[in-house]
Amino acid sequence: MKAAIIGHGKMGREIEKILLERGHRIGAVIDEANASELDAAHLAGIDVALEFTTPDAAYGNIRACIDAGIPVVSGTTGWTNRLEELRSYCREKGGALFYLSLIHI
């Protein structure tokens, strides 16, 4: 599996480590410094995006992945007031979103 990690803080770095230990590949690491790279061109060949950012960034990050045709797993909390909107958008675009509100590693 080739993953994109969106949010390279403590959780993002831990997920990266686990993925690599299990033989998966990291195709992109997106954080504040290169957020403009969250588009279809930079996500080409990615199987899944793992999104662990901030509530303010999560909605746009998830939408960008859906627009790029990349399934998303998000563990960012604090943005679920827009979850229904994203569910509708996923259905409309044929996208996939798996949201987890509490993750322990």
Q: Positions of the model-derived regions?
A:
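Glycine-rich adenosine-cofactor-binding loop
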Residues: 2-14
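NAD(P)-binding Rossmann-fold cofactor-contacting core
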Residues: 21-38
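Short amphipathic alpha-helix with an adjacent loop that forms part of the alpha/beta core around
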Residues: 37-45
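N-terminal Rossmann-like NAD(P) cofactor-binding module of classical short-chain dehydrogenase/reductase
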Residues: 49-50
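ADP-ribose/adenylate-binding Rossmann-like module
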Residues: 64-82
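Rossmann-fold NAD(P)-binding glycine/threonine-rich loop
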Residues: 76-98
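Conserved small/polar residues in nucleotide/adenosyl-binding loops
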Residues: 103-105
